[in-house]
């Protein structure tokens, strides 16, 4: 130990030491620690925006019961607007129902969508942003596509 350090230690024990140097040192360290804590908390993200990752849009299903062939265009418009459509043709005459299904299925194909028969005279037409799971293709093979449209 050098003579200067020994002298400073003795003076410190007696209470005559210069505490200003130590106080300044500890104050600087405390300020540095506060700055570190502040930057850790914010992560240096000034101007950052929080964006929700829940982007799933609620899809509405349109149910239509066309009375005339002209109604088939409004069904196609719904598909073009990316809305699934359930078409109820139970009360339509056979020729009209066949024409509507032909027109809407063509529009569905042109838009990249799909169709599914879900019941007697009831069809589901969906745009390309909707998938249909579960199929009833066995009924189509056995009874034909329009077997339930007879009156």
Swiss-Prot record:
Where found?
Answer: Cytoplasm
* Pfam families reported in the protein's UniProt record: SepF (PF04472)
GO cellular component assignments:
cytoplasm
> Which keywords does this chain's UniProt record carry?
Cell cycle, Cell division, Cytoplasm, Septation
Main localization category = cytoplasm
Q: Does the keyword Electron transport apply?
A: no
This protein's source sits in the domain of life called Bacteria
* Keyword Ion transport belongs to the record: no
BP-aspect Gene Ontology terms = division septum assembly; FtsZ-dependent cytokinesis
- PANTHER family annotated for this entry? CELL DIVISION PROTEIN SEPF
Record function comment: Cell division protein that is part of the divisome complex and is recruited early to the Z-ring. Probably stimulates Z-ring formation, perhaps through the cross-linking of FtsZ protofilaments. Its function overlaps with FtsA.
Q: How does it assemble?
A: Homodimer. Interacts with FtsZ.
Regarding protein family, the annotation reads: Belongs to the SepF family.
UniProt name for this protein: Cell division protein SepF
Q: What is the organism field in this record?
A: Desulfitobacterium hafniense (strain Y51)
In the UniProt record, the gene name given for this protein reads sepF
């Amino acid at each position: 130990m050098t003579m200067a350090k020994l002298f400073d230690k003795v003076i410190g024990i007696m209470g005559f030491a210069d505490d200003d140097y130590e106080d300044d040192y500890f104050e600087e360290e405390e300020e540095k620690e506060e700055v570190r804590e502040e930057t850790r908390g914010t992560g240096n993200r000034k101007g950052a925006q929080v964006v929700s990752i829940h982007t799933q849009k609620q899809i509405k299903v349109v149910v239509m019961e066309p009375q005339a062939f002209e109604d088939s265009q409004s069904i196609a418009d719904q598909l073009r607007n990316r809305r699934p459509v359930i078409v109820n043709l139970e009360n339509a005459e056979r020729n009209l129902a066949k024409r509507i299904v032909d027109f809407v299925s063509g529009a569905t194909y042109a838009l990249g969508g799909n169709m599914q028969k879900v019941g007697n005279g009831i069809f589901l037409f969906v745009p390309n942003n909707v998938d249909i799971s579960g199929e009833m293709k066995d009924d189509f093979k056995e009874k034909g596509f329009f077997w339930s449209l007879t009156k």
